[in-house]
């Protein structure tokens, strides 16, 4: 058994003993047959930023092979505003590397994200997912490097206020229960997201915490690990779908809205980025920010208008981007500064083995911490067109 995969929460990874990037059609069919999966879902992001779903009952193996190979027709004009009804048919073709067992389905169901294709069987050039794919591919072809990203997904949970163990207003950062009321909900979300293939770094309660008209509003965050940029967008789409579905199950209202009310913390979707080559992080050189990293930051300064257009699509986005709320208000960058457009966070650049200092019985590990350095784009929020933003 591959020890790197033995603890993976995705059932297909555990069963097939291979990473998702190596999934084949034969793997999908084998898993469906041996795990008695009865339904297949095709899922795809539409212009409104939400995942759409097409359900299939598995009649026999021939039918299963047909839908996995040929996909299905959909009405593009009902999915995207830029497609006219007069010529709107599109194909959706599943991407096997995105397969996961639906954690909410009562009937055993395998779900996959899909790509859009036009009438000629070519990728739909205007599809946001394909735009990101092209940008990522071009970046690698031009630079010989890989662009990776990870998101910090912030959201509010809203439920009736019990009046017990009141948290301090706007002091909810990393709060524990019973002052933080929705830790169990967040950890269940994290478990389900991991089962769908999401690579999670951690979760915690966030700054925003207040009561209004008999309801408690508690802000939470789930942060991911850096992965290839297209995968980063996919897992954020699925994560939002998981959080909304679980909120519905619990009877909670969940919102990714950038701003709920003035004077309270808004919710962002900060994006961390790093550039990789031959498995090595290119963001540091000799313990300081590399020329490659500085060029990337300069590019983000130049592209700030486009980043804002795709990252802040709701009018309430701009009520969040105000001073004294840990939100950027100027096109600039800085070390450890949460008020800039691009922050350079702590990156374990010091040559100190903190683990041995905290745990005297441990020998020095010589752990390679250079992989950890990222730069963080802080302006986007939950209204973002994820694929266009990351492109």
Question: What is each of the regions a protein language model found here?
Answer:
Residues 176-180, 209-212, 227-234, 257-264, ...:
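Alpha-helix capping and helix-loop boundary segments enriched in small/acidic/polar residues
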Residues 101-109, 146-148, 212-216, 264, ...:
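Short glycine/proline-enriched loop/turn "hinge" motifs that connect secondary-structure elements
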Residues 43, 53-55, 113, 156, ...:
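Structured core elements
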Residues 2-35, 43, 48, 64-67, ...:
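C-terminal accessory/tail domains of diverse enzymes
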Residues 7-11, 167-169, 270-281, 367-373:
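Short acidic (Asp/Glu) and glycine-rich catalytic loops that position anionic groups and cofactors
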Residues 192-199, 204-206, 216, 221, ...:
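N-terminal structural module
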Residues 1-210, 227-241, 252, 382, ...:
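ATP/Mg2+-dependent ligation/transfer catalytic cores
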Residues 113, 152-166, 209-223, 257-279:
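Histidine-centered divalent-metal-coordination microenvironment in nucleic-acid enzymes
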């Amino acid at each position: 058994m591959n020890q790197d995969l033995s603890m993976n929460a995705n059932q297909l990874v555990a069963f097939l003993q291979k990473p998702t990037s190596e999934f084949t059609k034969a793997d999908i069919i084998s898993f469906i047959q041996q795990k008695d999966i009865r339904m297949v879902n095709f899922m795809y992001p539409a212009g409104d930023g939400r995942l759409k779903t097409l359900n299939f009952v598995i009649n026999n193996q021939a039918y299963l092979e047909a839908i996995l190979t040929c996909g299905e027709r959909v009405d593009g004009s009902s999915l995207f505003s830029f497609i006219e009804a007069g010529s709107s048919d599109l194909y959706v073709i599943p991407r096997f590397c995105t397969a996961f067992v639906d954690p909410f389905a009562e009937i055993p169901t395998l779900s996959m994200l899909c790509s859009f294709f036009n009438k000629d069987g070519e990728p739909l050039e205007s599809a946001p997912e394909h735009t990101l794919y092209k940008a990522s591919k071009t970046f690698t072809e031009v630079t010989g490097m890989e662009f990776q990203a990870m998101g910090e997904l912030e959201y509010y949970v809203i439920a009736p206020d019990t009046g017990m163990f009141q948290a301090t207003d706007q002091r909810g950062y990393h709060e524990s229960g019973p002052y933080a009321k929705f830790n169990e909900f967040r950890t269940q979300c994290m478990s389900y997201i991991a089962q769908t293939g999401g690579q999670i770094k951690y979760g915690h309660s966030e700054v925003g915490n207040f009561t209004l008209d008999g309801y408690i509003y508690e802000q939470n965050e789930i942060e991911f690990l850096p992965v290839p940029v297209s995968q980063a967008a996919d897992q954020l789409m699925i994560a939002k779908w998981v959080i909304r579905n679980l909120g519905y199950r619990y009877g909670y209202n969940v919102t990714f809205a950038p701003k709920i009310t003035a004077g309270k913390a808004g919710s962002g979707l900060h994006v961390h980025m790093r550039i990789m080559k031959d498995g090595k992080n290119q963001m540091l050189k000799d313990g300081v920010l590399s020329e490659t990293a500085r060029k990337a930051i300069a590019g983000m300064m130049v592209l700030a208008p486009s980043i804002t257009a795709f990252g802040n699509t709701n009018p309430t986005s701009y009520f969040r981007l105000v001073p004294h709320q840990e939100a950027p208000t100027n096109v600039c960058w800085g070390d450890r500064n949460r008020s800039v457009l691009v922050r350079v966070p702590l990156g374990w650049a010091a040559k100190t083995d903190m683990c041995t200092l905290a745990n005297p019985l441990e020998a020095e590990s010589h752990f390679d911490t250079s992989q950890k350095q990222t730069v963080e784009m802080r302006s986007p929020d939950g209204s973002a067109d994820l694929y266009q933003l990351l492109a």
